[in-house]
């Protein structure tokens, strides 16, 4: 099992692409929701 960390300055759009690709490759991304907009505000 592999683990990846996404830098804090990566845009939300790119972060989403990275997380989707990591899921395909079975890579754990613990910081995947670090910059995701809150769903509670809607």
Swiss-Prot record:
Q: Which Pfam families match?
A: Ribosomal_L32e
Q: Which InterPro entries match?
A: Ribosomal_eL32, Ribosomal_eL32_sf
A molecular function (GO) term: structural constituent of ribosome
Which Gene Ontology cellular component terms are annotated?
ribonucleoprotein complex; ribosome
One GO BP annotation of this record: translation
Keywords of the record, alphabetical order, are: Ribonucleoprotein, Ribosomal protein
Instruction: Return the similarity comment.
Output: Belongs to the eukaryotic ribosomal protein eL32 family.
Q: What is this protein called?
A: Large ribosomal subunit protein eL32
Whose protein is this, by species? Zea mays
Q: Which gene encodes it?
A: RPL32
